[in-house]
């Protein structure tokens, strides 16, 4: 298995990315291609790691403040070169750089799975149960039609089943109330269409995401990104409040010591790094979009995520799901025959 790693564009430079690759190679067997500035990367690559990786040198990358469309023109940028390597035989790509550039190039260079109108960003959300919830779209498509959300539901269902090994996953539609009549026009129209699928649970509220009421939560990319960023902010704020209160008195410090195991579990379940990155579902190869602020642990987990996606053949599974569950795709196949 060959995994392409975009070294460029992450908030903290190349070091966390290289450290994440090194840690993953200690636990998993895979080949990797690092794409980026060799001069910046070499000081952090040990002789042992150098013997395990291939390095493709380029100094160009798409900066966060640049338009995503720049990636199409910049054929020597790290993400363009990486996407070409993926297209021509590699199995997966991971990037903590410009997410818009990654999404755009993945769609253009790899192509969409047949029947998919819009690829979606899929992210894992912590829940009170033993397994996280899947949320999509988390930001790829701010303006959506009901048909797009149907695609998201099918892809999320298949990802939960194939990659996460959830048995008979249930899909919920994010709304401002669980009743069928709640929601804006997009939600109401999507709800009518989703009723045709056995996996559809119904409408869910924002709080249900973290209760584990359903396995997959579907929404447009605008709402999904707001949910994601709000969750990150709340988790960070709660962590800061805990730290301040623990430091406030000797009694609090002793109590925290007694609850250390519980706090460790809470931290692990709410730490974005433990979830790796966000798969871009709907394109013809596995692409993982990592957070710009990813540390070494986040990159390491993103690699494990990519390996699971490739081993489970999720792209093929989504293709098959669309052929069997989406009427327009199966009808098209019959006409072609």
Curated annotation (Swiss-Prot):
Which InterPro entries does the UniProt record give? FA_synthesis, Phospholipid_synth_PlsX-like
SUPFAM superfamilies given in the database record: Isocitrate/Isopropylmalate dehydrogenase-like (SSF53659)
Q: In which pathway does it act?
A: Lipid metabolism; phospholipid metabolism
What EC number(s) does its UniProt record assign? 2.3.1.274
Where would you find this protein in the cell?
Answer: Cytoplasm
Query: Which reactions are catalysed by this chain?
Result: a fatty acyl-[ACP] + phosphate = an acyl phosphate + holo-[ACP]
Signal sequence segment? none
Record GO terms (molecular function): phosphate:acyl-[acyl carrier protein] acyltransferase activity
Gene Ontology biological process terms in this record: fatty acid biosynthetic process; phospholipid biosynthetic process
Q: Which UniProt keywords apply?
A: Cytoplasm, Lipid biosynthesis, Lipid metabolism, Phospholipid biosynthesis, Phospholipid metabolism, Transferase
Q: Which NCBIfam families match?
A: plsX (TIGR00182)
Q: What is this protein called?
A: Phosphate acyltransferase
The taxonomic lineage of its organism, from the top, reads: Bacteria, Pseudomonadati, Campylobacterota, Epsilonproteobacteria, Campylobacterales
Q: Which gene encodes it?
A: plsX
């Amino acid at each position: 298995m060959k995994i392409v790693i975009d070294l460029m564009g992450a908030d903290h430079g190349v070091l966390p990315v290289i450290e994440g690759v090194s840690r993953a190679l200690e636990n998993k067997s895979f080949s990797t291609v690092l794409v980026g500035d060799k001069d910046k990367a070499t000081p952090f690559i040990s002789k042992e790691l150098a013997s395990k990786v291939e390095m493709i040198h380029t100094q160009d990358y798409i900066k966060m403040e640049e338009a995503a469309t720049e990636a199409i023109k910049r054929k020597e940028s790290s993400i363009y070169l990486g996407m070409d390597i993926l297209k021509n035989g590699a199995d997966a790509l991971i990037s903590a750089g410009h997410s818009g550039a990654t999404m755009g190039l993945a769609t253009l260079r790899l192509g969409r799975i047949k029947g998919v109108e819009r690829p979606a960003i899929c992210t894992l959300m912590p829940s009170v149960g033993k397994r996280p919830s899947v949320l999509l779209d988390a930001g790829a498509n701010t303006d959506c039609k009901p048909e797009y959300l149907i695609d998201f539901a099918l892809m999320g269902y298949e990802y939960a089943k194939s990659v996460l090994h959830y048995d008979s996953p249930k899909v919920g539609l994010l709304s401002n109330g669980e009743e069928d009549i709640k929601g804006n026009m997009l939600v109401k129209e999507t709800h009518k269409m989703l009723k045709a699928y056995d996996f559809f649970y119904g409408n869910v509220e924002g709080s249900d995401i973290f209760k584990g009421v359903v396995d997959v939560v579907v929404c447009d990319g605008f709402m999904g990104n707001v949910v994601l960023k709000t969750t990150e902010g709340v988790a960070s704020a709660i962590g800061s409040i805990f730290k301040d209160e623990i430091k406030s008195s000797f009694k609090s410090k002793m109590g925290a010591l007694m609850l250390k195991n519980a706090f460790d579990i809470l931290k692990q379940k709410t730490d974005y790094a433990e979830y790796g990155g966000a798969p871009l579902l709907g394109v013809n190869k596995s692409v993982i979009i990592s957070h710009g602020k990813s540390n070494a642990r986040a990159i390491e987990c993103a690699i494990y995520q990519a390996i699971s996606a490739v081993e489970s053949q999720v792209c093929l599974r989504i293709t098959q799901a669309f052929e069997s569950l989406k009427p327009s795709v199966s009808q098209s196949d019959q006409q072609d025959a």
